[in-house]
A protein has these predicted regions:
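C-terminal domain-boundary segment and adjacent tail
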Residues: 31-105
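Active-site-adjacent pocket scaffolds in enzyme catalytic domains
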Residues: 1-44, 103
Length: 105
């Protein structure tokens, strides 16, 4: 079993619906988390998850803030520092690594 982390803190549903943060607050959470993890990733590879739900951040009035956060991350992808992908693609990649790289393989 391969587990790709599901984020509780960088998750639009509890942040916006339960804690009543604004969509701009959520976008700042995304970029702050990203910037800090980018710095930490200089020492070891890291995975950053963002949980998005269409009924929350997918609402048109919230999309602009999300777009700004994603564009911030894309600038780093375009210079080869990050890989933006989906959990299934990470799982496929991990399963193709040499035996012993992934614990339990």
């Amino acid at each position: 079993i391969l587990h790709v982390p599901y984020p509780i803190e960088v998750n639009d549903s509890p942040v916006i619906c339960n804690r009543m943060f604004t969509h701009d607050d959520f976008a700042k959470i995304i970029t702050d988390q990203f910037d800090q993890m980018l710095d930490l990733s200089q020492r070891q590879p890291l995975i950053m998850g963002i949980a998005l739900h269409t009924f929350v951040v997918g609402q048109p009035f919230r999309l602009l803030a999300l777009r700004r956060a994603l564009e911030h991350m894309l600038r780093h992808r375009d210079i080869g520092k990050v890989w933006l992908t989906r959990p299934g693609t990470i799982a496929d990649y991990a399963m193709q690594l040499p035996k012993g790289i992934v614990p339990g393989s």
